[in-house]
Amino acid sequence: MINFNTLFEAGHAAGLTDMEIYVVKNDNFSCKVFEQNVDSYSASVTQGLSFRGLYEGKMGYTYTEKCDDSSIPFIISSVINNAIILEKSENEELYGGDEFYTTLDLYHPAFNEITPLEKINFLKAVESECFALDPRVKSVNYCAFSNGTSEIMLKNTKGLDLSERQNFAYTYASVLVTENGENKTDGDFIISTNFTDYEPKSFAKKIVSRALAQLGAKKVKSGTYPILLRNLVAGDILEAMSDIFSGEAILKDLSRLKDKIGMVIASPIVSIIDDPHLENGMGSSSFDGEGVATYTKEIVTNGVLNTYLHSLTTAKTFNVAPTGNASRSSFKSSVNISPTNMYIKPTQTSFDHLLTIIQNGLYITDVQGLHSGLNGISGDFSLSASGFLIKDGKLDDPIHEITIAGNFFDLLQQIEAIGNDLDFGPSNIGSPSLYIKSLKVAGE
C-alpha cells in the first residue's frame, strides 16, 4: 500500500497545498447455476486510489490502480497538469472532519466464512425446488449469488483520517412458467449477510407462486383508475427521480424543486427520509465521499420540502451546512451527490387494508421502461405495466399489456394512503406500497 505521508510530502514539495487520498479495496465473488451446472464463476480482488490536490488555487484530480510508492511521481504530476488545464475553479475545499462519527455495524465477518461450495449448493437447491413445485415451471432462467467486502480509506492534509469496511451478499433467481402457450416470468431477491436467511424451499415457493399468478392475464379497458403501486415499483420510480433532491441539480436548473424549500410538494401524509445509519442499508455509512459525518434527515415532512441534499461545494453555495450526501461511485469518479438510504416513510396500514380502502382499481406489480419512459426533470412518465385487478377489496385477475402515464410531481400529491411494507429490494432507495388516487391507463 502506498505511504500516505510520503505522498503528501512529495505533493508539498511540488507546490500542492491541500491534498486528499481516497482508497478503495473490493473483494468480490459471484457465481451462477443453470441446469445444475456452474454457468459462471468469478472471484476478484481490486483496489485503486484517487488523489486530488490544490495547485495555484485550482483542484486537480487523478486516479490509479497502482497503489504503491512507485506511483507517487505519476500521481503528483498528473494532479498538477490537471489543475493547470482547468479554466476555472469551483471553489472546492477539503474537509477537516467532524467531532463525532456514528459507529456502524457494517461488517459481518461470519458471512465471509461461507464457502463457495455452500453458495453453489444453495443455488442448485433453489433450482431443484422450483422445478419440483409445479410442472408448469419450464426454466429457472436465472439463479445467481453475489457477495463482497469493500474497504474505504479517506485521508487528507487537513487532519481527516477515516476508514470503513462493510460486506454485502444477495441472491437472485427467476423462473419461466408456461401454460397453453402463454409464458410468464418472475423473480425475487434475498439480501442478507446472515446465511441462515438463504432457505431454498421458501425462496423457490415465493418465486414460482408469483410467476404462476400471472398466467391467464388479461388487458383492461383504457381509462383512469385508482392505482396501488407495489412497494418495489414505487421505490424504482422514486429512485429514477432521486436527482431532483440534489443541490447540484438545483444549481443547474435540472430540478422542478428549485426555490421550493418550505413549500408543499406532496400529499400531507408523505414524508421522505434519508437515513445513512439504517441497519443493513445498501447505502449506510458513517461518513460521505468527502469525509462529512452522515446523519438521518427528513427531506420531506408531511408533504413539505425541508432540504436539498448537499456536498461541501453546493452547501457553500446555498450557505447551509453539508448534509453528508457527497458520493463517489468508485475511486475513478469525481465527487457527486446522491441519497444514502432514501425511502418514503411507512405507516401502520397493512397491504390488505389498502386493498379494502381502494375497493376497485389496479395493483401494479411491475413496470418497464423507466430509463426511456420517464423524464427525470419534468417528471412525465409513460410505462409499460402489469399487475392485477382489484375487485371488491381483493386481488382478482392478472392484467398485462397496459401502459400507465402521469407525472411524478402530480403522483406525490395524489398519494391517498401508504402501507407498512417498506422494501428496498437490491437498492438504497425504497418505498412501501402506495395508493394513488388516479392514473391514466392505456389498455384495449
Report the location of each language-model feature.
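N-terminal small-residue-enriched
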Residues: 1-444
